Amino acid sequence: KEKKIDTSLDYTEGLKTYERNLQHVINLSLCNNIKVILGTYCIYLYPEIKDDPLHKLYQKIVLEENEVMRKLAAKNNLVLIDTASLISKEPTNFLDSIHFTSQGMSLLAQCFAEKINLE
């Protein structure tokens, strides 16, 4: 029997935990002189799923996670690579809603390589 996911559940505590955990990783990295570069998460709601309530909720949460990432980058004066904005949402870049094709992965690598080479 397939379980149904309740899309009305409150996920805000999860976002707080996400932010807290990321801040801990940032703190540990910086204390150990490890340079930190943050990146936003890409999601692509292709035509077959763009109106599905569960996928729309997942996208909403990912967008809020990306805001947390932006906030932490600003708070900690870190480089942020906004891949969610830099990589176009099109089938040539995504196998599904969250996994890149080889072309998409190349674009992701290029985004990070450019920033790493500048640092």
What is each of the regions a protein language model found here?
Residues 18, 79, 93-119:
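Histidine-centered active-site loop/cap adjacent to the catalytic His
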